[in-house]
Amino acid sequence: MGQKAPDFTVNTSKGPVTLSSYRGKWVLLFSHPGDFTPVCTTEFIAFTERYKDFQALGVELLGLSIDSVYSHIAWIRDIKEHFGIEIPFPIIADIDKEVARQYNLIDEKSGATVRGVFIIDPNQIVRWMIYYPAETGRNIDEIIRVIKALQFNWERKLATPANWQPGQEGIEGAPSTVDASLKRDGEPGVKTWYLKFVK
């Protein structure tokens, strides 16, 4: 985290994709253990149902597993047939596990990809990553909240407190000298010298 996202050129369910071609945009890269699995299916439906919300935030979605592109195509068709949902974003066919290894997404026991999430900023820096247990589906609301918090930081250079929601106050960085800390005394939003809330 905080490092440049490893670049890649891969085959996907929508044709070849190069990560660096997304420079200037936010990217949500997420891996799943396998096509035609119950938890993953609910996640892809959930991501699709919130796709417009991601688009409104300027976020491009990229799914990934080590299944073949033909498996992805068949799964996408199956989801459309049984749930009436058309997956709008590319799914990477990482059959040689190259991208999964670059991003440390391989489960050593099963050999499959783990349930990982990476948020990559417009400068192609990894800003957030999280791994979910294989048996636990992702919380899309929380992923969107984190994206909004990171974009708030990007625009305002402010951190966000626990349980922050859009529209709430941010936190200014702590002073790095005694003099700077003394200057804060009595300023609006100051709770103590190292904690200052800013609207």
UniProtKB/Swiss-Prot annotation:
Keyword Cell cycle: no
Pfam families named in the record: 1-cysPrx_C (PF10417), AhpC-TSA (PF00578)
Binding site for substrate: 115
The enzyme's E.C. designation: 1.11.1.24
Record's subcellular location: Cytoplasm
Enzyme active site: 40
Reaction(s) this enzyme catalyzes, per UniProt: a hydroperoxide + [thioredoxin]-dithiol = an alcohol + [thioredoxin]-disulfide + H2O
Domain Thioredoxin: 1-152
SUPFAM superfamilies: Thioredoxin-like
GO CC terms: cytosol
InterPro entries in UniProt: AhpC/TSA, Peroxiredoxin, Peroxiredoxin_AhpC-typ, Peroxiredoxin_C, Peroxiredoxin_TDXH, PRX_1cys, Thioredoxin-like_sf, Thioredoxin_domain
Gene Ontology MF term list: thioredoxin peroxidase activity
Alphabetically ordered keywords of this record: Antioxidant, Cytoplasm, Oxidoreductase, Peroxidase, Redox-active center
GO annotation, biological process: cell redox homeostasis; cellular response to stress; hydrogen peroxide catabolic process; response to oxidative stress
Family: Belongs to the peroxiredoxin family. Prx6 subfamily.
Additional observations: The active site is a conserved redox-active cysteine residue, the peroxidatic cysteine (C(P)), which makes the nucleophilic attack on the peroxide substrate. The peroxide oxidizes the C(P)-SH to cysteine sulfenic acid (C(P)-SOH), which then reacts with another cysteine residue, the resolving cysteine (C(R)), to form a disulfide bridge. The disulfide is subsequently reduced by an appropriate electron donor to complete the catalytic cycle. In this 1-Cys peroxiredoxin, no C(R) is present and C(P) instead forms a disulfide with a cysteine from another protein or with a small thiol molecule.
Oligomeric and partner information: Homodecamer. Pentamer of dimers that assemble into a ring structure.
PANTHER family, per the entry: THIOREDOXIN PEROXIDASE (PTHR10681), THIOREDOXIN-DEPENDENT PEROXIDE REDUCTASE, MITOCHONDRIAL (PTHR10681:SF128)
Purpose: Thiol-specific peroxidase that catalyzes the reduction of hydrogen peroxide and organic hydroperoxides to water and alcohols, respectively. Plays a role in cell protection against oxidative stress by detoxifying peroxides.
Protein's UniProt name: Peroxiredoxin 2
